[in-house]
């Protein structure tokens, strides 16, 4: 007979107070700025990075996957052979992290902060009677600074900060949940690559908006020189004739020379493909998932593509979130949180495949079957 029940619940008691209401922190001016959304900003570095199409696509893929999955709670118990996960009833905030927002929204922007800045911040707005958090709100990472860890230019964070300033005001670190990514934020670690992509896109924009002639009329050497007005009139009359006739006529003194510029050269297609590949390396997402041409590549079905996206793009950030939320400052010791990834990896696909595999009607000696 088991000594412990596997139906143990971890339902949180009703919240009784806000996190900052009874704070004994000496300076907590930053808490007064929480929720003042008109002051919120994502910063210049974030805007520059998201202006690169490949980075924007990678962020959309990773954020859409993680933010669409449900969180579930469990504890671990020794069953005589190995540690076994025992499901627990979730605390109320797992279904509504921020009472004023959806889980999809707060998790999407948390993923963005972890990708771009290497860290993210949640402020605890309410606590339950046992002292554990009951509700959170996200603080934009671009507005949070840490005096004990500069972070830039490498974007490396060594541990949760004890001196956090939000929007210029110091905030009690005990009222914060600090998520630290295992990789540097790309706005710090890939500044040159991002700047190169932006300059390349600017060059393509200039070329796209500039009118390059399809050909040049060249007056031969030894001929009577023409003034600028005469040259302009000659080109205009030539264009008018070509617009209404299939055949053009030129005197021996004037030659028509086609320009060697092609649309792919004008739009720097090869350079753009290479830079997109570089950005896929920066984001850690396989290039084929970002619709980048990778030459000859083995066929990959939908299930394998999902597994690649989860393994190479999402797993580390998802683990950062769940391990942080499983810490003792968020949940009681021994209580853990994880994402339910079954539906994403193969759950719904298996259901679809079962529906598609319908029994075929019988065939007899080539005679068509009729119902």
PLM feature spans:
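Structured, contiguous alpha/beta core segments that scaffold functional sites
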Residues: 2-268, 272-274, 278, 353, ...
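Activation/maturation switch segments at domain boundaries
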Residues: 2-5, 11-13, 62, 297-316, ...
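Active-site-proximal structural scaffolding
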Residues: 115, 210, 230-231, 272, ...
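Short acidic alpha-helical/loop segments enriched in Asp/Glu that coordinate divalent cations
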Residues: 247-250, 287-298, 324-333
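Internal mixed-charge
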Residues: 275-276, 281-283, 321-322
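Helix N-cap / loop-to-helix initiation motif
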Residues: 284-287, 368-370
